[in-house]
Curated annotation (Swiss-Prot):
Subunit comment: Component of the Mediator complex.
Binding-site positions, ATP: I32, G33, R34, G35, T36, Y37, G38, L39, V40, K60
Name the UniProt record assigns to this protein: Cyclin-dependent kinase 8
Paired cysteines (S-S): none
Protein family membership: Belongs to the protein kinase superfamily. CMGC Ser/Thr protein kinase family. CDC2/CDKX subfamily.
Catalytic activity field: L-seryl-[protein] + ATP = O-phospho-L-seryl-[protein] + ADP + H(+); L-threonyl-[protein] + ATP = O-phospho-L-threonyl-[protein] + ADP + H(+); [DNA-directed RNA polymerase] + ATP = phospho-[DNA-directed RNA polymerase] + ADP + H(+)
Organism the protein comes from: Caenorhabditis elegans
Pfam families: Pkinase (PF00069)
Chain positions covered by the region annotation Disordered: 376-426, 510-529, 546-588
Length: 588
């Protein structure tokens, strides 16, 4: 029997239905992000009433018409789940044109941009790393939010820095709080009717994908989220992705990725039968061994070299953060620590005051990270021209990356042989202080806003989509290739504070390319990326990134949360009183 809805009732409902355009200003707003299934805009209410408080919101438009099953799942989870470290769904709108809008909390920052800010920041003496106490508070709040999800039988399945938001200057009770966003891939995993891998074979951005997923496990648990948290933790400590590997076009129906598995075992060692008894039962285990034989890589003899990797960051293998990281990155998912167990680790108990899920991770100090509207945009034609020039440069050196992998000396072209400007050694430990204090070490005659190249999360544009879908969504802008070796990352060469960076000279040095797509026909600042946190600034570099010899670059960082300085203006640094406050309070 078919149920019919009375036409008069439908007309009355349409007349009473509130239109998003009548309630919020957002039409002229820049696109600030892209979720798993839609675009996100910054919105403010038009009317001052009690229905919507006068503050900023994130307005997410679900792509397509009507309610897809994925959108329904995301909305259902948002409406049921409430936690201080989860983004809050305020309202759902359904337009007469069958468009679905979600009204969410607005977060000014995300971990992707925070990490990128520290990776690309320059200093003549030491790299400006994320303060250790800030890392500790961020990690605790991520664990708290994920423990709540797991306690309610929900897997996030897409944890990465871009999906971890930080509230900016706003209500004092919300400032600096971590918010986990984008539940588009989340699923309830209690008593599934089918194995999770049959329903969704490809989940989690591959830099943060657990080894059991990469090897084709038919069943997976909350341990995949814990692995992703461990990857984010390592990236906060070093400002580099721990399991970076080159980007390739990955088939949407196959989670296996040989280079990613090899990178994991290169650092963690090839698991023995005692380390992971079930690894030989994984569907793609034999495929891994076959690929290794064909490549001539003795993957089964890889030792654990994680401690050597962190030695250059002065993180001792006996320290509490290292030990917690090892627990989070245990290859056997049955032995991997849970979020609740990680929250009770000695790493957090050593703090003078136990961390809380509502703490301000900025510790009430000025926020040094640029706001979304302060990030400049680049003209599409200029970005395309820069991208084409860099492609030509890359084609002139096709073998340099392979030479480096084989340990052969590289033939550097003369115009690219200049050392990176002010490159600091990555082994220098960053103080636990706020980034503002370390700005005083930079003796800038003037600070100007510069276009710098950073690293691009390879899956900012979505989850393991095919090449045709990616090309269509990115406006036919070709995706850059990554160097075949892991970080450290290079620095822009010959940067002059009066003129900005010169034309990029490409080098096949370690590190990803820093591709920043600019989609023709879209609002400036609109870049594909998951969730309201997926915003990327197209002005932060050309579409193919710089790779120069050396280590994380030093350079511009906006001060005190203010807009980037204009040409000819000097950016104020912290005063002596601020430095003393940080030394006495935040460095303890």
């Amino acid at each position: 029997m078919t149920l019919m809805i009375d036409e008069n009732f439908k007309k009355q409902l349409a007349q009473r239905r509130e239109r998003v355009e009548d309630l919020f200003y957002f039409e002229n707003s820049k696109e600030i992000g892209r979720g798993t299934y839609g675009l996100v805009y910054k919105a403010v209410p038009k009317k001052q009433n009690g229905q919507f408080p006068n503050k900023e919101y994130a307005l997410k438009m679900i792509e397509g018409q009507g309610f897809s099953m994925s959108a329904c799942r995301e909305i259902a989870l948002f409406r049921e789940l409430r936690h201080p470290n989860l983004i809050c769904l305020q309202r759902v709108f359904l337009t007469n044109e069958k468009k679905v809008w979600l009204l969410l909390d607005y977060a000014e920052h995300d971990l992707w941009h925070v990490i990128k800010h520290h990776r690309t920041a320059k200093s003549k003496k030491v790299p400006i790393m994320v303060p250790r106490n800030m890392v500790k508070n961020i990690l605790f709040q991520i664990l708290s939010g994920m423990h709540y999800l797991h306690s309610n039988w929900v897997l996030h399945r897409d944890l990465k820095p871009a999906n971890i938001l930080l509230m900016g200057d706003g209500p004092p009770d919300m400032r600096g709080r971590v918010k986990i966003a984008d539940l588009g891939f989340s699923r309830i995993y209690a008593n599934p009717l089918k194995p999770m891998a049959e329903l969704d074979p490809v989940v989690v951005t591959f830099w943060y994908r657990a080894p059991e997923l990469l090897l084709g496990a038919k069943h997976y648990t909350k341990a995949i989220d814990v692995w992703a948290i461990g990857c984010i933790f390592a990236e906060l400590l070093t400002a580099e992705p721990l399991f970076f590997c080159k980007e390739e076009d990955i088939k949407a129906q196959n989670p296996y990725h040989y280079d990613q598995v090899k990178r994991i075992f290169h650092l963690l060692g090839y698991p023995s039968d005692a380390d992971w008894p079930d690894m030989k039962k994984m569907p793609d285990h034999q495929r891994l061994l076959s690929d290794a034989r064909n490549e001539g890589t003795p993957i089964q003899t890889f030792p654990n070299s994680l401690h050597r990797y962190f030695d250059k960051w002065k993180i001792n293998s006996q320290s509490s953060p290292y030990r917690l990281l090892v627990k989070l990155l245990t290859v056997d998912p049955t032995k991997r620590v849970s979020c609740e167990e990680a929250m009770n680790d000695i790493y957090f108990r050593k703090m003078e005051r136990p961390p809380r899920e509502t703490d301000d991770v900025f510790n009430k100090y000025p926020i040094p990270y640029a706001k979304k509207e302060q990030q400049m945009t680049v003209a599409p034609d200029q970005a395309q021209q820069q991208h084409q020039q860099q492609q030509v440069q890359m084609q002139q050196q096709p073998q340099m990356g392979q030479q480096q992998m084989m340990g052969q000396p590289q033939m550097v072209q003369p115009q690219m042989g200049q050392p990176p400007m002010g490159g600091a050694h990555p082994g220098v430990v960053a103080p636990d202080g706020h980034p503002h204090q370390m700005m005083q070490q930079q003796q800038h005659p003037q600070q100007h806003h510069m276009q710098y190249q950073g690293m691009h999360d390879p899956m900012q544009g979505g989850m393991d989509e095919g090449p045709q879908a990616k090309m269509m969504r990115m406006g036919n802008v070709p995706v850059g290739r990554y160097a075949p070796m892991p970080p450290p990352y290079g620095a822009p060469q010959d940067y002059h504070p009066q003129q900005g960076p010169p034309m990029v000279q490409m080098m096949q040095q370690p590190g990803p390319s820093g591709y920043y797509p600019q989609r023709p026909g879209q609002p400036t600042g609109a870049v594909p990326g998951p969730g309201p946190q997926g915003y990327m600034n197209p002005q932060m570099g050309m579409q193919m990134g710089m790779r120069a010899p050396g280590v994380p670059p030093q350079g511009y960082m906006p001060g005190r949360g203010m807009a980037p300085p204009q040409m000819g203006q000097q950016q104020p640094g912290p005063n002596q009183q601020q430095q003393q406050q940080w030394q006495q309070q935040y460095h303890r």
